[in-house]
């Protein structure tokens, strides 16, 4: 079983330089790992068994299995209630009149592993875009400043390069920050879109699936219909048509066991709650981002919290001189640079910025 999940190990690698935030990582790391693991779990027939087993008189089992796998199986919604073994064979499996009674086909069954993998790709797209747009800028600026044991000569040289870059490119980082904000918005749009996509995939059953499962546990046994048995039945029906000896069409009703649905029902209960939590956190993250863009005072407080070792006057001066793009880059640097070195960077930036301010005041008199 552990060999099956070997391909997921690469996603567990911790990046040396952080270019995003925790909510962002929940999308492209946690969610992608979860979806790929689920996809591999469903795909691993050798560990779980045959995906479908059908029985019907006079039809070879292999033929029936293949036919029902291709054309999908169905249940009868009117037969979801009743005593198993007396009124119905299993919930949703009972006698019906073809063409009159409503039947529900479960066409999703053979596509679950592919859809889960496709969802994992979609969750990685914003990360891929941001990594391409970011272009390794933070990594180049951090260099070895994330190590507390770097020697003084090397530290001073690289710190000077960083400060010179920042002063020389002041007010030129808005587009850099804007592209990250776009990727954050894409994360939110993606997770909301995924909820609707899975709802469409499961024929409108996903949007209320988790809440229905919770309600099911609170109802009396004789009053409840198991939503997991409705959406992911373990036993279904399959109708096979063939020509008889006289050339007439014969109809054969078969029972099919869908063993993977015992896994699928748990997977989608988990995904329902995970997507809800992820969408709420992503929404809060967007509100936070809007507040950061619109509030210079909030940016000052956040930078102060990030550089607690620096003097408050120096932090205030730097925050006031930075626009949103400069602030964002400086804040991201604070996540990756050693706190003591970051304090010195803030101090050097403050000194350079105050020096530029004094020079600007002196120029009219010098002229």
UniProtKB/Swiss-Prot annotation:
One of its GO terms (molecular function) is gap junction channel activity. InterPro entries: Innexin. It is found in: Cell membrane; Cell junction, Gap junction; Cytoplasm; Apical cell membrane. Induction: Expression in embryos at ectoderm/endoderm boundaries during gut organogenesis is induced by activation of the wg signaling cascade. Its main location: membrane. Monomer and heterooligomer with ogre or Inx3 (via cytoplasmic C-terminal region). Interacts (via cytoplasmic loop) with shg (via cytoplasmic region). Interacts with arm. Belongs to the pannexin family. It comes from Drosophila melanogaster. Residues 130-179 are annotated as: Interaction with shg. This is Innexin inx2.
